[in-house]
From Swiss-Prot:
Residues 714-739, 786-822, 906-969, 1024-1045 are annotated as: Disordered. One of its GO terms (cellular component) is plasma membrane. Residues 133-399 form the Protein kinase domain. It comes from the Eukaryota. This is Activated Cdc42 kinase-like.
Amino acid sequence: MEYPQIDLYEFLTESELQQYYNAVKNELKITNAAQFKYAADEDLRFIGLSRPEIRRLRKFYEKHFPHSYLSKIKRLLQAPGTMVKREEAPGGGSQVALDGSSASACSSLAAKNGASSPSKVPNNKHIIPADSISVNKQLGTGEFGIVQQGVWSNGNERIQVAIKCLCRERMQSNPMEFLKEAAIMHSIEHENIVRLYGVVLATDSLMLVTELAHLRSLLECLKDSGLRVSFLTIPTLCEFALQICNGMRYLEQKRLIHRDLAARNILVFSKDKVKISDFGLSRALGVGKDYYKTNFNVNLKLPIAWCAPECINYLRFTNASDVWAFGVCLWEMFSYGFQPWAALTGLQILEAIDAPNYQRLEQPDCCPSEYYTLMMKCWQDDAAKRPRFGEIYDQLPDMKPEQLKAVVNCTEPKKDHLLYRQGDIISVLDRNTGTPFWKGVLSTGKTGYFNPSNTVAFLEGLPSSTRDSFSRVSDHRISKRKLRTEMISKPQNDFKHTGHVGIDGATFGDIAFLGSSQNYNHVPKQIVTPYKPSEDIEQTPLLLPPTPTSPDSLQTASGYFPEGANSGGAMGTSMNPTFIPSAEHTPKLIATNGQSSFDFASGSTNPFFPNRGDDELEFGLHNYGADGKSVHSETGWRPTSRSIVDDPHEYHEISDDEIAADKLDFGPSLLDEINSMFGSISAATGSHPKSPGFDHVNNKNEITEMSAKLGQKSGDTNGNKHGHGLLPTLSKKKSSGTVKPISVKDEKILNHAIEIANEISARSMIDLVSDQTPVIHSPKRKFSFRFPHLSNNGSGDKSGGLGTSGSAHTPTHGNASPFPKKKNFTEELQSIPDIQSLIGKEGLEAYNSLIERKALLDIGPSPAATLLRHLDTDEFDLQSLHQSQRPMTLPTRGATQRVRKAELAAGLSRHNDENSNSLEACESPSYMTHGSYKFPEAQPTEQLPEPESPNPIPLPPREGKKQVKTSTKRHVRKYPLIIPANGLQRTLSKLADFGDEAAKSPEISTSSQPQPGRAIEVVAAVRPSGMRRPSRPSEREYENMPTVGKESAHTYQNLDKLTPADAAGLTDTASLQFESIMEADTSKEGILQSPDVTDGFYNFSIQKEHYNKGKDAEFEATQISGLYVNDDELRNLDIESSRRTATPCSSCSALESEHSQPDALPSTESVSEVSRFSSVDNELAGNALFKKVRASVNMAMNRKSVAETSLTSNQPGGASAKPQTEAEYFAATAARLADSNSVSCEDLLEFSDKKPKGCERGVDSDEVRIMVKVLGKDSTPNRCLGALEFINWDVHKSIKLIKLQNLVSEANLSLEASFEALQQHEWDLHTTAHKLNGLKL
């Protein structure tokens, strides 16, 4: 029977494979059904056919093309006209359907027209007869004519084509030239260039027959807003740009020019395929100057906006001009079809793009920054500088924007920010936004900024976790035999493939049943590396006691009493599923003879026993007999060592690095295992007597089991309480990782069981402290378990026979908890070694020197003494604990004051002995309480240490005592800060108070005599530690640390002696900072000897000396003339003097008690006034820094004028002198400043109200200098001065006035006009200038 030739589409339709028509035609280049003979199965699978579809295709192929010699002979004898020889398909491009609907639509359309669409035409057949073309409908109108859809009947094929009708009137070249160009166009074969089938020569028009693109042009698709979300996303546009560049690169290699590259000439064939059309059409039609230069109108669509300047000016079309057009095409794509240079005429476009003042299109909102950079390169004015298509094609793959996936929702939408949800895909447009945010675009086309930290990288191509079906496309099984039962292989060396376990350890499905087998050990395991209990068990407990979630309570409560098996079987216990270790992430419960167990992957990860080197594994409830044979004694039965020898609870962890055994070992038979179990149980129960109190323990054990059963919700359970655990998998339940908190009742029961186990233990805890190597466990030693010790990381057994004696019935301290709180007091006490013996002779000597003599050394307790705080001091007797200990907490201010008053009442004098520091108060630093500095109090001469006396070594502070750190180092001036005037006032007031107190004391009656011959020394910032610690002059003493003598410590008092007004206005920290600088910067001796510094010291010394003289002579402070003292100081001196004369002794002490913080008066009132003055001299003896300064100061003092000396010497006798006038005041100030070449801080404070204002200084004022710096060359000092005087010396407004005049210089605004203009716009300079002359800012 003969079969006629069948069309490819009809053949596929009959085979029900019509959906593969486009793929067969374009990918496999099959044009008729007979060519399926040469298509291999791999080729068909490549285009998506499944095996059943391939078999169906072969079946219908055999039907239409049987393999018989008769058919071959007939085929050879057929007419040549019916067998059209085809040549190879173009370019190997792939055109796949958009989806099933569009593919079926294309197929139905092809079936309707009864034609297929071959991608190849006969060679040299670019002239097509007019009668072979049938026009169906018009698709649109182009610049060169109309475009229609039709069918080309080529022999036995019908091809759907697009027909472009060109009017002869539009053609400016003769038909022969056009045919030459058409022949060139016909020879182009590329996957991204539309194929030209041929040309139809009609009488009135020319028709170009090309491929038909069902999805219209790219420009139409871009303008369709509905396609933005589903189709034309940014990644798709980037892929289209690469395909367009690929086609243009092909033309560039062929030395061909397109001349009209634009989005309207890019045709979309599928969701991922575009092709360039109308190649060379303008040249074929002979379009010349008129088309390009005279078609200037507002509605211009072609092609001025796409042409390079040289094309418009000189009609010079090159590949560089195509590159320019490619840049414009990219701009169209990323602007979604927006017309370039919209609303501009051709002449305006030429003016905009032509040099020298050329402009360029702005970056579209959805355009990635890299692509816009490429556009700017394509729009280089110099054609030679534009990149070539080959270079662009190499760059484009690396320019694709990165895609990110949002992991959180955008909760707070902001302006210009993306509003995205979790799971949205964001394409990055720009990373360099100048902000922490990136610019991106969603798949919806919305652009904005987003936080990149809320996203992760999105990779396409990764397999989805929610697959609808299990795909086996990659399986290349060639055999067509059906799958039969005998073809399913038996387990080969392993159960992995039956348990959904791959060779690499990857699993899917439920593999819990694998873990229930005792003999199968190849379930993948993983050691949890971030947490290793064996490494930090000594530092940190796994769980906080007394929670029963640790395995110790489990073992003691449920698994360590073999007598619980009433029927002779192995004792089966049910375990509460909440008993999982804290380090487990995914616990797997393995049923072992009815016993739930956790398995450690290796002994090194088990915190409850020492590491074992052997591979022998034993289950505690297998009850090995006395013969020593183990049912699992074969080596290699399990590749990991057992965590606890008799512990039935294995901590099972997943491990990737374990190597499975080479051969599957099923172990002994089930019958042998049961017999061995029975034998071991009978041997165990018959050979050992019951221990005392066993019944009580057993009852408690049963109660625990019952409570565990009641609380159990998930996990591997077994209810055969009496030990009928013969088949381990019969009572197994599905493993689960859920955790249920243990109830309070169960917790109490378990804790009670632990206490009972501790009470009946026959072993002492003292053995646990001894260092011993762990013994390899043997099968004979049943139920041997030990407490691990924190210092030992586990414990072994000293005697090998313990496992066979009473330990089988009475667990030897079955609590394996690593926590000390699990022990009772006796056990805890016995487990602690004798610290007295551990310390030794050297440690005891160090203890005595550091602890007992700490009053001298002033340190906290040693580490050994710290440890003693946790123990009973009755255990040992250290010989020097009789000394009174320093309190661990800071004493209160009230207690401190009471102690000091008691000392003063008893007339105590402090000496440098060992106990002098025990009752000393801990003072808070001054910066914690107040900002006023108390001048160093005078010290008794008998308390000053000898200069050659050794300085005690400072040691670390007491542990547990919160040390208040000193203030952080602040900005330090280059030159020392002179003590300001208010610091002077505080100093003088303290001296006055001290004089009052000294006058009150009966022991210092000789101290009232003045010291006129005392040399004037620098006492401004002298630190008392110079007297006490001459070897450490730079040590700072205003920390909260105990000192040798309280009198020698710096004290920073509150402003108790000042009036509220003084306290409010004079509380600065300048003097404090000066002292810190003096103490810290000991390397500035050269600077301190400079005239500036010595003058400052001199000035302050003069003030202090005269004040002392005036105070001792009982003169009014206001009569001190010629000195640099401000009004506030004079007023305060009056207050202090009146207080001294009018207030009795009792009122002074009452005044002190009124303040919240006492002044901590030193116990120096019993010392003579002579010693007070002499101690000031001794203050400088130990300070090397001030020694060097003293000489310079004294030299400066000797150089002072005779007039000032006489002025100061006349003060004591000038009690009746008149108050100083202002003229005298300024004269004295000028005289002082004449001899000084420094300006100190007090100068600035004093003359802050008296210095000349900026208006008085004129051009030299600071305001003018600032304005000149701000305005630069735009203004002069005189002009700035005029603006300042006009605006009443407001610098900011003056600057705006001059800037406004500069910005609107054409208007020649006056200051008045500028002021009014700025006033109207609320002094907004930019707005004012813009309103005045339209200036763009």
